[in-house]
Amino acid sequence: MTQPSPTRPPLNIVIACGGTGGHLFPGIAVAQELKKRGHKVTLLISQKKVDAQASKNYGDLDFRVIEAIAMPKIPSLGLLGFGLRLYKAIRFSRNLLDEVSADAVIGMGGFTSFPPVYAAHRKGIRTYVHD
């Protein structure tokens, strides 16, 4: 992405990057570079301990927590709970995208990425996936 200019305003970018350090830290690196270029960045992380601890070290970044949901491995009644949690995560993502007036969503991989990337796609917002 290019630097903002008088003809190109800063973008509002959401990065879904939580769940594991392998998804989180690349997302943080991308966020830092985008901020340097003048864009507004919101990072979506899971409620996992690794995300909470790491986010404390980056006070200049805007972190939001989204429920981390993984699909049950075998067909069971757990699918009902999964479906409800997935619906709530997508609804949360849609509301957040509206709140921050998102221009683009970057999914860094992992189960935390699906709800915001899906919500952005459904809203016609540009989506990017890195894994």
Language-model regions, residue ranges each:
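Active-site-proximal region of nucleotide-activated glycan assembly enzymes
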Residues: 2-9, 40, 61-62, 122-131
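A short, glycine/small-residue-rich beta-strand->loop->alpha-helix junction that serves as a flexible
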Residues: 15-28
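Glycosyltransferases and closely related glycan-assembly transferases
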Residues: 8-9, 91-105, 114-128
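Gly/Ala-rich phosphate-binding loop of Rossmann-like dinucleotide-binding domains
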Residues: 31, 35, 121
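A donor-sugar binding/catalytic signature common to diverse glycosyltransferases
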Residues: 48, 104-108
